[in-house]
From Swiss-Prot:
<dbReference type="InterPro" id="IPR029071">
    <property type="entry name" value="Ubiquitin-like_domsf"/>
</dbReference>
<keyword id="KW-0963">Cytoplasm</keyword>
<dbReference type="InterPro" id="IPR019954">
    <property type="entry name" value="Ubiquitin_CS"/>
</dbReference>
<dbReference type="GO" id="GO:0005737">
    <property type="term" value="C:cytoplasm"/>
</dbReference>
<dbReference type="GO" id="GO:0003729">
    <property type="term" value="F:mRNA binding"/>
</dbReference>
<keyword id="KW-0677">Repeat</keyword>
<feature type="domain" description="Ubiquitin-like 5">
    <location>
        <begin position="305"/>
        <end position="380"/>
    </location>
</feature>
<feature type="domain" description="Ubiquitin-like 4">
    <location>
        <begin position="229"/>
        <end position="304"/>
    </location>
</feature>
<feature type="propeptide">
    <location>
        <position position="381"/>
    </location>
</feature>
<feature type="domain" description="Ubiquitin-like 1">
    <location>
        <begin position="1"/>
        <end position="76"/>
    </location>
</feature>
<dbReference type="GO" id="GO:0005634">
    <property type="term" value="C:nucleus"/>
</dbReference>
<keyword id="KW-0832">Ubl conjugation</keyword>
<keyword id="KW-0539">Nucleus</keyword>
<dbReference type="InterPro" id="IPR019956">
    <property type="entry name" value="Ubiquitin_dom"/>
</dbReference>
<keyword id="KW-1017">Isopeptide bond</keyword>
<comment type="function">
    <text>Ubiquitin exists either covalently attached to another protein, or free (unanchored). When covalently bound, it is conjugated to target proteins via an isopeptide bond either as a monomer (monoubiquitin), a polymer linked via different Lys residues of the ubiquitin (polyubiquitin chains) or a linear polymer linked via the initiator Met of the ubiquitin (linear polyubiquitin chains). Polyubiquitin chains, when attached to a target protein, have different functions depending on the Lys residue of the ubiquitin that is linked: Lys-48-linked is involved in protein degradation via the proteasome.</text>
</comment>
<comment type="similarity">
    <text>Belongs to the ubiquitin family.</text>
</comment>
Length: 381
């Protein structure tokens, strides 16, 4: 078949290849045509640097695909690698070297196997397939080398079907790594996995240690449903925004999507569904929000205000609130202060009993207004 190779100068080379050709073979063909030695060639496809021993088929490169050719600059540069013991190693590298290559050089110098090496630069753990240039690592930059402890530990992953999977991991494993291990065992693609621990959704780039996940901890695996769905968000101005979401999206995710569309910072957004204010860490599925559901968006006014709540005993409680707070929210704040369950609270303002789903603004309750708290007797009606 024919494929194309585009150089940084904009020139396009046409090559006759077979799916079974290795990247080495392709580089040799480029050398025949253009005279560029293979060791100065880097080939990129779909944003990935191609490895010499792999075949075109491995990368799903098909007829008339276009590869990009980047030249490795000769001459390279020096970088430093500092270990936890304080020792500094000097390496000769090129910007186009991958993190794998750098780990191999460290192994040559120090004898530490690459799979026990974690490299950190500017507070970020470096991923094997990326290059030094990708991370803007320049001459005389210093990387930090942290060793992965051997031996690791076992953790458990519980699925919604109740099945428990046992994994061999290390504290330094990233959530990506854990998802890859789950894929190896269960065949579930990482992009369909959501991992939850202590009520928090775990982010791919972080490590188990970051979340204080220790041996024999149990994570919960929730599947992201493919395909997603549309929901609507209605603002107080009457405008309706359409969002593409999945049931497994958290309310945080939804607020981020609204920010992308409308530019409203998440901390100024309050989302209401079925009269309830939605909490950031929960998912759409938690609230039974289904396709074509409509959420209501209320803006939080900056700064908030104080109001007073007077009880029948004559005690006055001061609360920090915002106009956009619902009566539910106010009852929750009273519970936090006084320990009275919301279902035993009745709030009265201007002679009116206040309804849970409404906001302070709905009742024209302003700063330093006084509400009256009456307790509902148990068993009553």
């Amino acid at each position: 078949m024919q494929i194309f190779v585009k150089t940084l100068t904009g020139k396009t080379i046409t090559l006759e290849v077979e799916s079974s050709d290795t990247i080495d073979n392709v580089k040799a063909k480029i050398q025949d045509k253009e005279g560029i030695p293979p060791d100065q060639q880097r080939l990129i496809f779909a944003g990935k640097q191609l490895e010499d021993g792999r075949t075109l088929a491995d990368y799903n490169i098909q007829k008339e695909s276009t590869l990009h050719l980047v030249l490795r600059l000769r001459g390279g540069m020096q970088i430093f690698v500092k270990t936890l013991t304080g020792k500094t190693i000097t390496l000769e590298v090129e910007s186009s070297d991958t993190i794998d290559n750098v780990k191999a050089k460290i192994q040559d110098k120090e004898g530490i196997p690459p799979d026990q090496q974690r490299l950190i630069f500017a507070g970020k753990q470096l991923e094997d397939g990326r290059t030094l240039a990708d991370y803007n690592i320049q001459k005389e930059s210093t990387l930090h080398l942290v060793l992965r402890l051997r031996g690791g530990m076992q953790i458990f992953v519980k699925t919604l079907t109740g099945k428990t999977i046992t994994l061999e991991v290390e504290s330094s494993d990233t959530i990506d790594n854990v998802k890859a291990k789950i894929q190896d065992k269960e065949g579930i693609p990482p992009d369909q996995q959501r991992l939850i621990f202590a009520g928090k959704q775990l982010e791919d780039g972080r490590t188990l240690a970051d979340y204080n996940i220790q041996k024999e901890s149990t994570l919960h695996l929730v599947l992201r449903l493919r395909g997603g769905m549309q929901i609507f968000v209605k603002t107080l101005t009457g405008k309706t925004i359409t969002l593409e979401v999945e049931s497994s999206d958290t309310i945080d995710n939804v607020k981020a999507k609204i920010q992308d569309k409308e530019g409203i910072p998440p901390d100024q957004q309050r989302l209401i569904f079925a009269g309830k204010q939605l909490e950031d860490g929960r998912t759409l599925a938690d609230y039974n929000i289904q396709k074509e559901s409509t959420l209501h968006l209320v803006l939080r006014l900056r700064g908030g205000m104080q109001i007073f709540v007077k009880t029948l005993t004559g005690k006055t409680i001061t609360l920090e609130v915002e106009s956009s707070d619902t009566i539910d929210n106010v009852k929750a704040k009273i519970q936090d202060k006084e320990g009275i369950p919301p279902d035993q609270q009745r709030l009265i303002f201007a002679g009116k009993q206040l309804e849970d789903g409404r906001t302070l603004a709905d009742y024209n309750i302003q700063k330093e207004s006084t509400l009256h708290l009456v307790l509902r007797l148990r068993g009553g009606f």
